[in-house]
Structures are given as structure tokens and as C-alpha cells.
Amino acid sequence: MPKPLNIGLIGYGFMGRTHSNAYRQAPKFFNLQYEPVLKACCARNADKIKAFAANWGYESTETDWRKLVERKDIDAVDICSPNNTHKEIAIAAAKAGKMILCEKPLAMDSREGEEMV
């Protein structure tokens, strides 16, 4: 029986939808050690993120990515927000002890990328 992996998704655009679909479909294709749980999603617009959550099956929403990153019930933070936000979110998620999936580009330049790793 796979163990739950609680996902916190930041961003609800094309890549947020793509990743959400992948989380829902992956167990149908692969024998996974972990089962993705759509625990929370986050965006600044409360109405839009609530509609996104209802459509994709997320359990809860946040409008501040910092709150999502600090939540104890989130195991992995999936960063699908605008490119210029990746660095700050990824560093905060790492400091909070989360697993991180960051959409490309990882950073805006090599200096930012080095700061992240």
C-alpha cells in the first residue's frame, strides 16, 4: 500500500493544471511507493484558486505561499508560479524541510540558481 505524499501546489496556470493532472494519473500508470494527495493549492486570487481546487480535487487553498510552505501537513511543494518567484519560494521550502519540485526555469540566472542549491 503506497504511503501518502501530501502535495502543496503553488500556481494554477497551465503548468499547475498539468502537474495536477499528472498527480491524479500517475498511480494508474506506475506502481508508486507514494500516493500523491492533493492537499493544498495556492494563488493570490482567492476566488480563482478555490475554483481550481474544486475542479482538481485539492483539499484546501491558501492565498499566501508562505503559509502553504509552513504547513505541517505538506510534504512536497510544487512550484508552478511565475518564473521570477521560483527562487524565493524554493529557498523557503527547503528551509522548511519540504521536498521541492520546481518548474523550469529553476532561476532567472545562474547566480540565483547557485543561491538555491
Regions found by a protein language model. Name each.
Residues 45-47, 56-117:
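Beta-loop-alpha module in the N-terminal Rossmann-like domain of NAD(P)-dependent dehydrogenases
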